[in-house]
């Protein structure tokens, strides 16, 4: 059976991996998943990530914990294949009053809501992370 929403699967793997106190998780790789992992890493929600090349490239994400608790409190998919959510630059949401981030896919690539606001860009809201 084919996967309907690979991004939701990625977010679920991160959520489940941290709930099970895993050190690292792996999943099939794609350009969008690597871009999302890059945003999560630069914002400090995951330790690191790497793409393991092979016949089918795998994305390996090293999860981050603080005092034995997951750094990611919640991670939730917003825009999905059946209902895409797009926002203009002035409509971009602030997650937890600015404490969390919204991952946004813009014409200039995948970035946080903060970076999109500074660049005056709107786009598709991929997920919220807090």
From Swiss-Prot:
The UniProt record lists the keyword Ribonucleoprotein: yes
Gene Ontology cellular component annotations, sorted alphabetically: ribonucleoprotein complex; ribosome
Superkingdom of origin organism: Bacteria
Coiled-coil positions: none
One GO-annotated biological process of the protein: translation
Keyword Ribonucleoprotein: yes
Keyword tags: Ribonucleoprotein, Ribosomal protein, RNA-binding, rRNA-binding
Pfam families referenced in this protein's UniProt entry, alphabetically: Ribosomal_S8
Family label: Belongs to the universal ribosomal protein uS8 family.
Protein name: Small ribosomal subunit protein uS8
Organism annotation: Glaesserella parasuis serovar 5 (strain SH0165)
Gene: rpsH
């Amino acid at each position: 059976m084919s996967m309907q929403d690979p991004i939701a699967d990625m977010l679920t793997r991160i959520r489940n991996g941290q709930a099970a106190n895993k050190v690292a998780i792996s999943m099939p790789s794609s350009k969008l998943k690597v871009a999302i992992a890059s945003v999560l890493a630069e914002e400090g929600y995951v330790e690191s990530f790497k793409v393991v090349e092979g016949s089918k490239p795998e994305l390996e994400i090293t999860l981050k914990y603080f005092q034995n608790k997951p750094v990611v409190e919640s991670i939730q998919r917003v825009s999905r294949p059946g209902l895409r959510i797009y926002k203009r630059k002035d409509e971009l949401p602030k997650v937890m009053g600015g404490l969390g981030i919204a991952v946004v896919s813009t014409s200039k690539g995948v970035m946080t809501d903060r970076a999109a606001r500074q660049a005056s860009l709107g786009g598709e809201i991929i997920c919220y992370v807090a």
